[in-house]
Amino acid sequence: MKMASSSSALSFPLSNIPTCSKKSQQFQKPASLSKSSHTHKPSLKTQILHHKFTKRNLLSLTTALGFTSALGTVLAHPAKAEPEAPIEATSNRMSYSRFLQHLKENEVKKVDLIENGTVAIVEISNPVVGKIQRVRVNLPGLPVDLVREMKEKNVDFAAHPMNVNWGAFLLNFLGNLGFPLILLVSLLLTSSSRRNPAGPNLPFGLGRSKAKFQMEPNTGITFEDVAGVDEAKQDFEEIVEFLKTPEKFSALGAKIPKGVLLTGPPGTGKTLLAKAIAGEAGVPFFSLSGSEFIEMFVGVGASRARDLFNKAKANSPCIVFIDEIDAVGRMRGTGIGGGNDEREQTLNQILTEMDGFAGNTGVIVIAATNRPEILDSALLRPGRFDRQVSVGLPDIRGREEILKVHSRSKKLDKDVSLSVIAMRTPGFSGADLANLMNEAAILAGRRGKDKITLTEIDDSIDRIVAGMEGTKMIDGKSKAIVAYHEVGHAICATLTEGHDPVQKVTLVPRGQARGLTWFLPGEDPTLVSKQQLFARIVGGLGGRAAEDVIFGEPEITTGAAGDLQQVTEIARQMVTMFGMSEIGPWALTDPAVKQNDVVLRMLARNSMSEKLAEDIDSCVKKIIGDAYEVAKKHVRNNREAIDKLVDVLLEKETLTGDEFRAILSEYTDQPLNTDGDVRIRINDLISV
C-alpha cells in the first residue's frame, strides 16, 4: 500500500469541513437592505444564532478531524517499516537455543538483524533437510559474545536500521488523540453559557435545580385529608384564597405572605399540609428537599438556588416548597474552623432570592423543619418567612379526627370507638396514628379476621410504644421477681397522691422490657406540678423498693436500671430547670447545653461554681432518697395486697387497670388514683 493512498484518505474528509468563507456567505445581508440597516447592531437573537453556528462549525471540524485520524490509522503504513525481503521471506520461527546450536555446528550462513537487534532473520544450511532454511529468531538483545562468535564462524550478518514513516506516525498519533479531543470539545461546547458561565449550565447539569415542577399539581391530597392541625390548616386555606381571589385582599391594601415556615415534631403533618396546598391552590408548584442544593462541587448550591427562583419567577404566581430546610438554613458561623462555606454561600443566595434587592413578587416559599432553633435569624425575619406556623401534637379531638381520616378505607368492628382510642393515645402524632391503624389492619389479617377489633388496636398500641412481643417467660424465680417489680410500680403509683391511674400491668415482654406497667396519661404534659413530679419518682422507684423489701437487698436486680435513669433525670430537672428545691427558683442550666447541635453544646459556657454543683447533687440525692423511703413504706404496709396481685398476675399475665384497683381496694381504705385529671404521656411508661 503506497503513501498516496494515505494522502488521499487525509484530504477526502477535509473537503467537507465548513470554512469561514462559507460561513460568511451564509450570513451575508441582502443587497436590498437599506444602508441604515447596516449601521444597527445585530439583535440578541442574531448574536445567539451566530454563537450557535460558530459552535456547530467547531464541532463539525473536530468530528471531521477525528474521522480523518481514524481513517488514516486504518489505511496508512505502520509507523515502523523494516526491510521487506527478510521478513516476507520467512514465516518459520526458531528458539534462541536451537539457533546457538546451529551456530556452533557451522550451519548458520547469514543473519539479518532487525528491530534494533532484537529479531534476527537467519539462513541455516540444514543437512537433514538438504536445503537452506530461512527462520525468525527472537534475540535477548544483542550480546557481545554472539557477535564475536558469528565473526569467528565467518557468518555474514548485517544490521538493518529502522525506517520511520512520518506520515503514518502522524496519522497514528492523531488517531489516538481524535476521540478524546472530540469528547473534550463537545463537553466544553455543551457546558458553556454565553450569558452566565457559572449559572445553570454547569457541566453535566450540576447547576440546574432538582426541584420537581408541576404546572397543575395532582397530589391526590386536599384539605379534607388534613385533620388535627386546625390552626395551620386555616393559615394555608387563607393563602389558597389569596391566590384564587387576590383582588379581595388587594382592595384593602393587603399583600400576600412571601413565606410560611412550618415547625413542629416529626410526623405531625407538615409535609402533608404542603401536599394539600399543592392540590388546592391551582398554581404551579415546585418541591425539593433542603439537602438537594449541596453537592460535592463548589458553587453548585448557589447556582441551583438561582435556577430554582428564576424558574419560579417565570411561572409566578407559584409555590416553592422546601422540605427539611434546616439542611441548608442552619445558623451561619457555627461550624468548626469557620463553618461550611458552601452551605453558607447557598443560604446567602436563598436569602437574596427570597427578599433581596430585586424581590420575588408572586413566589410563595413554604418550608418545613423540626429543628427551628438552629435556623439562621436572617431566614426567619418578616419579609422572608412572614408566618411561622407551629404544627404540634394533636389533642384528643384532633386525634379523633385523624383516626377518622385513616380509618375510612378500613373495616372496623362495631365495638371499636375512635374516641376511646384517641383517649388512650395521647402523645401520638398523625404519623403514629396512621401507623397504628395500619398495624391493626395487618394484625387482624394475620389472625384471619374480616374486621379490626379493639384487641388488635390495643396490641398495636403496645407494639408501637414498647416494641414487638417477645417470648413469654417460663415460671420460676425470674418471673416472680418481675411480677413483684411491676406490682411494686403499680402499688406505689396508685397510693401516691398526684400520680396517674394504672392502665395495665403485664408480664408479656416487649422490646427490651421483660414486664410493663402502663399509666393513663393526661392531656397537657406541659403543666406538671411539683407534687406530680415527686409522685412519678415514687412510682418509678416502686419496682426497686418491692425487690428490696420482699427479697432483701442482696437480691435486688438490674431490672431497675431504666427506672433509676428516669427518676434521676426528673429530680435533676426539678432542681436545675423548674426551681423546685431548697436552692430556690433558679434556672441553673445553660440553654445552649440543651441544643441538639454538637458545636453549640461545645461552645456553651458553664457558669456554675463547684459549690453550687455540690448543692445541686445534694438536692437531687435528697429528693430521690425521700421518694425511695415513701415507696418502701407503701410496699411494707400493703404486703398482703401485693402478694395477692402477684398471684393473679402470674396466672393471667396481664391485669387491666380496673382489675388491679378492684383487688387493691379489698386490702386498703386509702383513696386510689382512679380519675385521669392529671396524667402524663403514654411514652412515660415504667418498665423493667
UniProtKB/Swiss-Prot annotation:
Zn(2+) binds at residues 485, 489, 563. Its main location: plastid. It is found in: Plastid, Chloroplast thylakoid membrane. Probable ATP-dependent zinc metallopeptidase. Involved in the degradation of the light-harvesting complex of photosystem II (LHC II) during senescence or high light acclimation. This is ATP-dependent zinc metalloprotease FTSH 6, chloroplastic. Residues 190-688 are stromal. One of its GO terms (cellular component) is chloroplast thylakoid membrane. Pfam families: AAA, AAA_lid_3, FtsH_ext, Peptidase_M41. Residues 84-168 are lumenal, thylakoid. It comes from Arabidopsis thaliana. Residues 1-75, 76-83 form a transit peptide. ATP binds at residues 264-271. The chain crosses the membrane at residues 169-189. GO terms for biological process: proteolysis. GO terms for molecular function: ATP binding; ATP hydrolysis activity; ATP-dependent peptidase activity; metalloendopeptidase activity; zinc ion binding. Its EC number is 3.4.24.-. Residues 25-44 are annotated as: Disordered. Keywords: ATP-binding, Chloroplast, Hydrolase, Membrane, Metal-binding, Metalloprotease, Nucleotide-binding, Plastid, Protease, Thylakoid, Transit peptide, Transmembrane, Transmembrane helix, Zinc. The conserved lumenal (CL) domain (84-162) is present only in some FtsH homologs from organisms performing oxygenic photosynthesis.
